[in-house]
Every structure is written in C-alpha cells, then in structure tokens.
Amino acid sequence: MKKLLFVLLTITLLASCQKVSVEQTKVIPEPIKKTTLNVGTLYGAQIFVTTGQGEAGFDFEMASRFAEYLKLELKMKPYSNISELYQALESGEVDLLAAGLADTPTRREKFRLGPPLYRVNQVLVYKQGTPIPKDVSTLEDNITVITDSSFVETLSQLQKLYPELVWEQEKEKDSEELMAMIARGEITYTIADSSTFEINRRYLPELRAGPILKEKQAIVWLLPPKNSDQLMSDLLTFWHYEKRSGTLAHLNEKYFAHVKRFDYVDTRAFLRAIDNKLPKYKESFQHYANGIDWRKLAATAYQESHWNPNARSPTGVRGLMMLTLPTAKQVGIKNRLDPIQSIKGGAKYLNDILNRLPDSIPENQRMWFALASYNIGYGHVEDARKLAQSMGLNPSAWRDLKEVLPLLHKRKYYQRTRYGYARGNEAVHYVDSIRRYYDTLVWVDNQNQLLIDEKASAEESQLAEKIGGKQENLSGAQPQ
C-alpha cells in the first residue's frame, strides 16, 4: 500500500513539474524584431524640413543613411520644442534625437552623446541699426533665447562674469522665429548658432551677428542614457564609415558652404525681384523646366540676367538666360531677347548638359556640375575633373571640384589641360550664388504655402461655426 502511494505521489509531482515547465514555456514571449528607427527632431532648414520636392535637412539625410545602414525603416517625429524632445527620448517614444543639438555639460549628464556631425559658433544676433555690442556687458536690452537650449547654459556661465546679465526664455519658439522677431523689431537680441544665422540672413538680410559667445561647439545626436549600448556601437561604426567615405564632408558642403557668402544689397534686391519680376515668368519656368526643379531654372536666370529679358553682355550673350548665338542655334532659339524663347532654350541647354554628364556623378550633385558647365563650358569642367583625379580627389564630388576649378586660371595647371585657361573661381561663385537664390525661392514657396494653409484652416473654422450656429437655431425651434 505504501509503495502504491509512493508511486502515485511521484507521478503526480512529475506531472506537476511538466505542467509548470509547459506553462513557463508558453508565457515566454518571442523577442519582437525591430523594424523602425524612430528619430525625434525639430523643424529647421538645416535639420529637417518638408517641401514640395520631399524631405531634406542635414540631420534627415544622416538619419536616412543610418536607418538604411541598420536595415530599418526611418520614421522622423518632429516635436514642438526641446522639452518635448527630451520627454520623448526619456519615455522611449523615440530611439534617438537628431535635431541640431549642441554638445553641452548638462546634456552629457542626462544623455549619451554621439560623435560630432559638424561644429558651430554661438553668436549674438541683432538687427541692423542697433548699436554694435562689444560684449554681453554692453547690451541695451535683454536677450531672448530658447528654453532648454545650449544658449541658456552659455548665458548661465557668462552670468558668473557679468552678474547683471539677464535673459528671457521662449519655450514655444525656435531660433528661426526669434530671428524673425529680431528683424521685425519685436525683440532686440537673441543667440543663434552660426550655421542657422547664415542660412536665415538670406531671407532676413537685416540680421547682424555680434560677438562670438562660444566657439566650435559640436552638433551631435542624443541617445538614451540606458539600454543604448548596441545603438551607440552601431552609430559609431556608421559615423566612421560615413566620415571615411566623404558623406559628412559632402553634407557640410551641401547645406553650409554656399551660405557663408552674403551680400545685403543683393539679397534685398532678390527678395524685391521675387515680388515684382518673377510672377511674369514663373509659369514659363514651370512649363519648360522638363524635369529640372523650376526654382533652380529661375535661380539660374536671375544669376544670369536678374530676370531682365533685354540683358546684353559685351561678350555677346543676350536675354533672360544669357545665351550665346551658337548655343541659341544649337537649341533651336531664333530670338534670344524673347523671354519665353530664352527660358525654353536655357532649360533645353541645361538638360542637354545634365544628360551628357558621366553616370558617376551622384544625382543630387549633377545640377552643380551642369551649372558650372553652363557658365564656363563643359570642356573646362571636364578638364577640372581630370585635374581632380590626378590630385587624388574625387572628380565626381562637387566639394572636390569646387576646390580644383579655381586652379584653371593658373598657368601651372591649365597648361596641362585640353581646353586651357578658364576663370574657374567665377564658376564656383556662380554655382554658390544660384544655390543661395534657389534656397530663398524654396523658403518663399514654403512661407506662401503656410499662409494658404492658415487661410484654409480659418475658413474651415468659420464654416464650422456657421453650421454649428444653424444647428443650434434649428434645435431651439423644436417643441419641448
């Protein structure tokens, strides 16, 4: 009897153990495979922006490459301010922050910081006509800066030297909005990083940069302080690869190099021309662009003639697109002074050059090569490419070619080329100017679209109020 009880007890225990084992096996979840890289960001010309041509920005392009490197789908999540960005990262809503944020002591304490993407200076910004401040101790008014920004940390450090220094913080505005307020005279001073300042003074030429408050501050991505070892390891490997391959140098050139040159008079004149001259020719630019962004075509025409259909040059070029007589014949144009024919001919000539360029030149840089060819001739650009290759540079990278083109006016170099002497430095300036005009046209387009959206939203609200009012009146007329 005892043996029987022992056997039954043993069987029961074994069954129980097996049941527990099975139950435990059932409740262990399968690891969820990650499919998306969620990136917190802020809107900004050099950070992340959406246009009619798609999404752009230094941080966006780097994030796109990083997601591709990780074999994940990229999801950019814009937030209203830095505080919301921090909360999103801390809560796990996003995997990292790519928002043009600077390396600061406070951020190092709270988060893990990635490697430097580029470096900026912090500059004091004021409006033309305001007395030029020598340093922050001579300011006539308070400084207004963004809440949680690196500028607040800089001011806190400066306050130790200048105890009377005071500032105001804006949580719901970004640097671009504060600089617009400077231009309108609503505030007197703000602080911006040098890149953001240089980009925005193209649209707000009244802006001026005062003393540099902090030099060569690294712009980095922010990662969570915990459970991000693998992501940090992947980011560092990715960064080293992109640095060696020239991607970082290319993006720096793309977003920042051409904006360093600034001409107040020219910028004001261009903004006036957008209002007064461009409307006459806008439809023609759009109609004949044929695959080219019409704003690049319009920017080229402005660089050539300032949108003057009767423009003439002692060298024989004429019209809105300043075509030579041989080029006009080549593209089938009879009257170079007819603005419509000129636009049609200039667009065809540019497209012909684009189609002629080697396939090795990346799509996002082909226009700059084509414009340089439009300016000094395709042969000279080919000479510069061969010269770049002989110097160990990349002949298909615009950042390298713009370093070589100016050498074409030096005997030491041009005597080795097929087509000889050329003013290559003028070609570089020519392309940079067109890129600035193009960026301004994109900005104006975006501003106009915002106004259209705001007007439509206001009309919808008014319509909803009217409908709501009618329904209220109808319900009031019903029997009780």
Swiss-Prot record:
Top-level enzyme category: lyase
Localization per record: Cell outer membrane
Protein name: Membrane-bound lytic murein transglycosylase F
Species in which this protein is naturally found: Shewanella sediminis (strain HAW-EB3)
Coiled-coil ranges (or none): none
CDD domains: MLTF-like (cd13403), PBP2_YfhD_N (cd01009)
Entry membrane topology: Peripheral membrane protein
Keyword presence, Disulfide bond: no
GO biological process entries: cell wall macromolecule catabolic process; cell wall organization; peptidoglycan catabolic process
Record: active site: 304
Signal sequence interval, chain numbering: 1-15
